[in-house]
């Protein structure tokens, strides 16, 4: 059984208040996109934009990409997932992952320990709770005593795992319904997807800078790369992908506290690999390479203000293909 090709978008959009997203979501549906995938870091939470979309756009599939396994209690997470399943029957998918030590530990004061087991345990708990079981269990990373959901759901939604390296990628295929990947090139997809297994959904957040101004691309792209690829989980990911030698000067400068030197150490061709940019046709062709290499659900994230993001949405619409 092959996984259908879908057309997602990352939401919410920078510079657009949540209450103003209705017309954006309605246009996204009209343009032929199939999915909205929310991000959660230092802005909106992952669920609220999707709850709004559930009411505003009854045709769109809604997914979190991703919810950290650490930052909500087990029961609270199950209740939130169940609420989304009821709000958008047959249209909700849960993306869950470790997140990073920055978000979990530095921002939320929670120990970032045993990430693989934490995600695995959370998936197992959610499957039991959403099935209506009364859960009492000593998991490896947390314990639950006597919890039963007070609302019924008619289905367990697809659960996808944010994954970078082989262990978590295999977990995504073994205990999840697929993987959510990001910060990788189109060619990197070929190294990642086989670890998940066959007939699994692969959602990719792909960063898109909708301009052919090379100077702007280098300026914005290098700063985005420096901000992410110095986070330990992403540094380890790119070392595994074979970029250790390329990125070592950036890592060394960052560790020394020289942010300017770290940014300057990023090669231009790495920006070209990790940030999709160019003319509308060049962007479309680059995004198509991700799909050709195994991504079933691209979810472009536009690194742009509202006007440029709206323009890019229209230029890259599935209805234009």
State the predicted function of each range:
Residues 1-321:
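Active-site-adjacent structural elements that line small-molecule/cofactor binding pockets in enzymes
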């Amino acid at each position: 059984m092959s996984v259908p090709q879908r057309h997602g978008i990352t939401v919410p959009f920078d510079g657009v208040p949540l209450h103003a997203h209705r017309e954006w979501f309605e246009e996204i549906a009209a343009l032929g996109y199939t999915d909205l995938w929310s991000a959660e870091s230092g802005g909106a939470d992952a669920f609220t934009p999707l709850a709004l979309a559930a009411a505003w756009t009854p045709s769109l599939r809604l997914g979190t990409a991703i919810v950290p396994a650490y930052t909500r209690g087990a029961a609270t997470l199950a209740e939130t997932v169940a609420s989304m399943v009821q709000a958008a029957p047959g249209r909700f998918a849960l993306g869950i992952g470790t997140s990073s030590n920055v978000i979990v530990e530095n921002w939320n004061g929670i120990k970032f320990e045993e990430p693989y087991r934490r995600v695995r345990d959370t998936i197992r708990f959610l499957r039991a709770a959403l099935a209506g079981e009364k859960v009492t269990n000593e998991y490896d990373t947390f314990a639950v005593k006597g919890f039963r959901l007070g609302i019924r759901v008619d289905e367990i939604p697809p659960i996808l795992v944010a994954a970078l390296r082989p262990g978590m990628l295999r977990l995504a295929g073994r205990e999840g319904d697929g993987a959510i990947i990001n910060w990788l090139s189109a060619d990197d997809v070929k190294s990642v997807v086989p670890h998940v297994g066959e007939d699994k959904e692969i959602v990719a957040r792909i960063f898109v800078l909708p301009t052919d101004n090379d100077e702007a691309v280098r300026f914005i792209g290098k700063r985005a790369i420096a901000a992410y690829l110095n986070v330990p989980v992403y540094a380890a990911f790119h070392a595994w992908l074979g970029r250790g030698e390329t990125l070592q000067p950036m890592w060394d400068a960052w560790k020394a506290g020289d942010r300017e030197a770290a940014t300057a150490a990023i090669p231009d061709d790495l920006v070209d690999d990790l940030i999709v940019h160019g003319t509308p046709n060049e962007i479309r062709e680059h995004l198509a390479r991700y799909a050709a290499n195994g991504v079933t659900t691209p979810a472009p994230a536009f690194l742009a203000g509202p006007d440029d993001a709206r323009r890019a949405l229209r230029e890259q619409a599935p209805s234009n293909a």
